[in-house]
Design a protein with these regions (language model features):
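C-terminal transmembrane beta-barrel domains of outer membrane proteins
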Residues: 68-220
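Transmembrane beta-strand segments of outer-membrane beta-barrel domains in Gram-negative
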Residues: 1-104, 184-186, 190-193
Length: 220
């Protein structure tokens, strides 16, 4: 079980007038003067209270071969705590590591998140975890190969599947090293106004690829 508090302040620096329009500029332009987005742009404080439950049965934290790491997190951002607007973010995370032999591991992660209330635009990109808040759907920690923070909304669904093969163990200068080859598929989506459970598997943004990693011992 975990509990804590945090404080975040966000500022904006305007782009030069001759700069290319950003995605945010395009959204504001399409919303018009009566839209809700322009009112949430100036920046400010987002101070929060957080509680959660964590279940961790991994055999080791790095290079996990088997086990489960699941989280249920609730983050309240109340106005009485000094925030510019009040809202609640809840997040469900389930990570499972399935051994397929001594050197092969199937790793899966599912994240479902929703924001209830009027969160400012700059807070909608946050994906909360018990360890560290991440930013956005898109980028090396969510949808690999897609630009960071590319998709933003109140509701979020993400699924990562990765097959990892510990291909070789060797040593350099007396230090134990290993090489891991992997292939992955990442898929997910957002909803502007909140989760729609019946649409989890429609209009998905998908990326796939592979990689190579080198590790030292069992800790790095």
């Amino acid at each position: 079980m975990l509990a804590g508090v945090g404080a975040t302040h966000t500022d904006f620096d305007p782009l030069p007038k001759d700069a290319t329009a950003t995605l945010l500029d395009q959204v504001i332009g399409s919303a018009g003067t009566t839209g809700s987005i322009p009112e949430t742009i100036p920046g400010g404080w987002s101070n929060h209270l957080r509680v959660g439950l964590v279940w961790d049965t991994r055999d080791r934290e790095t290079g996990t071969h088997r086990g489960t790491w699941s989280e249920v997190l609730v983050q309240a951002v109340p106005e009485f705590f000094g925030s510019e607007s009040g809202y609640v973010r809840w997040t469900l995370v389930d990570r499972r590591f399935v051994p397929l032999g001594d050197r092969l591991t199937l790793a899966n992660r599912v994240i479902v998140q929703n924001v209830e209330g009027e969160a400012p635009f700059y807070d909608l990109s946050i994906i909360q975890t018990s360890f560290k808040q991440r930013e956005g759907l898109g980028g090396g920690r969510t949808l690999r190969g897609i630009p960071r923070n590319r998709y933003v909304g109140k509701g979020l669904f993400l699924w990562n599947a990765e097959l990892r093969w510990r291909a070789a163990d060797f040593s350099v200068a007396g230090r134990p090293l290993h090489m891991v080859l992997s292939t992955f598929v990442d898929t997910g989506r957002v909803w502007a106004d909140g989760l729609v459970p019946g649409e989890f598997f429609s209009d998905l943004h998908t990326a796939y690829g592979g990689g190579i990693r080198f590790g030292m011992g069992e800790n790095f």
